[in-house]
Amino acid sequence: MTCCNQQSSQPKTTTNCAESSCYKKTWSDHRGTRIERGCGCPQVKSGIKLECCHTNECNN
């Protein structure tokens, strides 16, 4: 499966993943809204929005 793995508003990059899902985490800090993308569907702390999906590049 192919997932996006760029940070925040960086140009789109992708990676091939062994997992069958991709994730997109969104949170805010002193720098503003932060976004992290990658493979799998990790556990997150409260206050972090997590979206997981199951198709190629679905986490852009």
UniProtKB/Swiss-Prot annotation:
GO terms for cellular component: extracellular region. Disulfide bonds join C3-C22, C17-C39, C41-C52, C53-C58. It is found in: Secreted. Keywords: Acetylcholine receptor inhibiting toxin, Disulfide bond, Ion channel impairing toxin, Neurotoxin, Postsynaptic neurotoxin, Secreted, Toxin. Expressed by the venom gland. Signal peptide: none annotated. Pfam families: Toxin_cobra-type. Its main location: secreted. It comes from the Eukaryota. GO terms for molecular function: acetylcholine receptor inhibitor activity; ion channel regulator activity; toxin activity. Belongs to the three-finger toxin family. Short-chain subfamily. Type I alpha-neurotoxin sub-subfamily. This is Pelamitoxin a. It comes from Hydrophis platurus (Yellow-bellied sea snake).
